[in-house]
Each structure stands twice: as C-alpha cells, then as structure tokens.
A protein has these predicted regions:
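Secretory targeting and sorting signals
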Residues: 1-27
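Acidic, metal/ion-coordinating pockets
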Residues: 2, 22-383
C-alpha cells in the first residue's frame, strides 16, 4: 500500500449496545504499520474532510489519470496530501459504495471504482465514515464490496456493516497517545429499505442510540469519541433545526461529568457550513464536498459551492487529570475546492496566488465557517 500510515488501528467488537458493553469480550485487530500503541499520553492532531462523491466525470478523470490502467485517484488528491499525511489521524467521508468489473456509475445511483480506497489511503487517510444516504445504492452487495476494498487498502471504516458482529463493533484508532473511537450515522438511505434481515447494515441517526454507542466506546477504552453525522438540508449554508437540536443534545450528554462525545463531523449538505463550539465541544455542521463533479442545486442551477469544502484540523492535548477529557487546544479550518477543469482538489491557501477568483472562493468559505461565532472560540484558518 502506498502512503504513510500513522497509527495502529484497533477493532473492539461487541460494544455498541450500552447495556451489553460490559458483557462482551474486547477483540484487538491491528492494521497499518503493526507498531504497538504508545504507552505515554501525548498530544495529537486530527484532520477531517467532507463528502467523496464521484460523479461520472470524476470517474472518467481517474481513468484518464491511470493512463489506461484502471483508475487512479491519487493525482486528484495530491493537493491536500501534505495536510492529510502530516496529521496523526485523518478521517474522510466515503459517501458512495463501490461497483465491480467496470460496472461504475455516478448520479443518481452511485457505484464507484474501488481504487478510490487506495487513493484515499495513499493520501494519508486512516479511516472513513460510510453511513450516508447513498449507502444502499447497490444494496448489501455494495456495502460488502466497499468495506472489502477499504480493508484491502488498509482504510478503516465506520457506519455500515457486512455482518451483525461488525455492526456491533467500535472502530478504534490510535493517534498519538490516545485511542480514538469513530462512529458514523446517516439521516436515511433515500427511501431504499434496509436489506431483509439486516437492519444493522447502515447506522441511522437516533439520539439515544448515538449516546449509548458513545458511552459504550468510552467504556471500551476510548480516550476521544468522534461522531460523523450525515445530516442537514442540501444547499443550505445554515444548519437546520435537526442539526442544531441534535448537536445540542449530543454535546450535552455526560457521564460522571465528562462529555460522552468529543467532536462532531457533519456531511451531506454539499456546501460548507459553520463550525461552532456547542457545550464546550466542537461541531462542524457541514464540511462540504471534497470530491464531486458538476453540482446542480435545488433550483436546478449549476452551483460552484458544491465543489467547495474545508478540512477541519484539531489538536488534542492529554487530560490534566485522570478521568478528565482530552482538550482541543487548537481548532483550524483549511479551505479547499475541487477544480472541475483540472480534476484536482486544491488547498486554497496554497492556490490563492492564482488569482482573485480563488481568493473570492476562500473568502466565501471563511464567511460561512465563522458565521456562528467560531472565531470567538479560537477557530483560525490553518496553513
């Protein structure tokens, strides 16, 4: 596998149901470098990015970049590789499932080439959330192919499952001196019913279940609990009522005075949305689309905002005393866009010298990201 792996990943099974958390045996599975987890607590950086949504034009671009030998998504992501690969832990959102044997498609029923998992891993990503409204575009077979390909690439995943045991597991990753649990949920599956006999195939938004899962992950040894949520109103810059209400409820949940959830990462709206500190916990309502083809908004008009996004970067410091939470000591956002002409993700901080147009995109993203007062809580634009 190409790319720098930055941590040992641990899978902890049988622990998502809070009532059963103490009864199940913890199972450790290593991936990546095979190095043992660090024993001393030390600070770490976490980077997160938005929806990977390969439309037909994106698939065609990856085919072109492979020079006739399959599909290569690495050049597409090369512009953000420096930021992603330097993080101790990097998480993406894989919105689509994978096809096979050339059966690939874009909107409205997505089936992406499995080589995208290799491209994400090569860029430095350690895992992806997979619960989305397109998670059942090809039924249970699509989920199986997707997670199989991620496993082969060394890319961890959370939010969908091939088996009931997998659905009951917690995705646990090592970052610095911390064990980080990654949970993932979606608002729905575009009215596609869950596979017969597999109600656990996709994790769906349910406040009580999400809190129970977070508590179970903590009981299993998670120092930091990160929750990815596929939610929001498409093409709306502002978070909607569900986002605001759920963010309040999730961040207010505590056990023995310690918050159950340490970071919330939002996707789905297609446009960047605000960052906000809610009850002392950072919430990104919407990261935007990291990779997408031409996007048409709810009025049927091509909308360039659908190719804008941010990378969120958070520095976590060890607790000041046993039993306390890991604290975010630095919160940053990095503006980026998917350039339709070149088929490349561009870090706008690095590309800003290319002209006023890109500067305008960066400024538009900044205005939305800071629209709920995040600057007052210390959020800054990162390099």
């Amino acid at each position: 596998m190409i790319g720098r792996r930055k941590q040992v990943a641990l899978a902890l099974t049988g622990l998502l149901a809070a009532a059963a958390a103490c009864q199940n045996q913890v199972r450790h599975e290593s991936a990546g470098t095979g190095r043992p987890a660090p024993s001393a607590a030390r600070a770490f950086t976490l980077v997160a990015s938005g929806d990977v949504l390969p439309h037909s034009s994106v698939i065609e671009r990856a085919g072109y970049d492979a020079d006739g030998n399959g599909y290569d998504f690495r050049p597409m992501l090369f512009g953000v590789e420096p930021v992603v690969s330097r993080a101790d832990l990097a998480l993406c959102h894989m919105e689509t499932v994978y096809g096979a044997d050339g059966d690939y498609s874009g909107y409205p029923v997505f089936k992406s080439p499995p080589q995208i998992a290799q491209g994400l891993a090569a860029t430095g990503y350690d895992g992806c959330s997979t619960a989305s409204d397109h998670a059942l575009d090809d039924g249970a077979a699509g989920i199986r192919r997707t997670l199989d390909a991620m496993d082969r690439a060394g890319l961890r995943h959370a939010g969908t499952a091939r088996t009931q045991d997998e659905a009951r597991s917690v995705t646990m990753l090592q970052a610095g001196g911390a064990r980080v649990a990654h949970l993932s949920y979606a608002f729905g599956t575009n009215d596609i019913p869950l596979p017969t006999g597999q109600p656990w195939a996709v994790d769906l938004i349910d406040r009580d279940r999400m809190i129970a899962d977070a508590r179970a992950a903590r009981q299993a040894g998670a120092d930091v609990v990160v929750v990815s949520v596929h939610w929001g109103t498409e093409w709306q810059d502002a978070p909607d009522r569900l986002q605001l209400t759920l963010a309040q409820q999730l961040t207010a949940s505590k056990t023995n005075g310690r918050p159950d959830i340490d970071l919330i990462l939002g996707t789905h709206a297609h446009v960047p949305q605000a960052y906000e500190k809610v009850n002392g916990t950072w919430v990104i309502y919407g990261l935007g689309d990291q990779i997408a083809g031409e996007m048409y908004n709810d009025k049927g008009v091509q909308d360039s905002r659908g190719n804008d996004s941010t990378l969120g970067r958070f520095t976590f410091a060890p607790p000041v005393r046993p039993g306390a939470r890991w604290q975010v000591t630095k919160a940053e956002y990095i503006p980026q866009m998917y350039d339709l002409d070149s088929g490349r993700v561009r870090d706008l901080n690095q590309a800003i010298s290319d002209g006023a147009e890109l500067e305008g995109v960066r400024d538009r993203i900044r205005e939305v990201v800071l629209s709920r007062g995040a600057a007052d809580d210390g959020l800054v634009m990162g390099e």
